[in-house]
Amino acid sequence: MKRWQSWLLLAVVMVVVFCGYVFLQLRTIEVERLSDDLWVLRGLGGNTAVLRTDAGAVVVDTMLLPLQGQRIRQLARELTGADTTQLINTHYHIDHTHGNPAFEPGTRVLSTERTLSHLQALDADFWQGEAARLLPTETFSDRRTLSVGGKTIELIHPGAGHTDGDLVVLFRDEGVLHTGDLMFNHYYPNID
């Protein structure tokens, strides 16, 4: 077999394996209720938070693919009975942001300034056309407190950690902290 054919076969096998992996993840999402109005979605390669407010759902981290984002959007609607009005990206890595385009135009998207800067610089090809509408629309550098539909959410940039634009999300009323990739269970996080 010619060398290029071997590489092509390897690429096809990798694509098939990856598609199977994504399909299995979408079928095996574990939903855990943390409070009356807060859920965590597990099984997408990370944790996505979904908060019900009187002004719609708030989603933290949308995962790797628009297909995963569609599933998150669907689950958020089922859990909260409302459309998602706000997305929060804890950092710029694609496994936390590339589901954004699955959400409706006009969805408020929040991140740190550094996260937006990295998304625009490092991943510019992805964020063209329709996807550009779901880049972060509001940014901050240090800390921001949101009042959303009767809920208080604090966005805190603790400094450089996993990336230089990390943020943690404190759901004040629920007493829950979403740490993005700053904390892992049973191992240490990577640092860029």
Go through the PLM ranges and name each one.
Residues 40, 58-61, 85-89, 154-155:
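Short catalytic-loop micro-motif centered on adjacent basic/acidic residues
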Residues 63-70, 94, 134, 192:
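Soluble non-cytosolic domains of exported or imported proteins
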Residues 139-176:
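Core dinuclear metal-dependent hydrolase active-site scaffold
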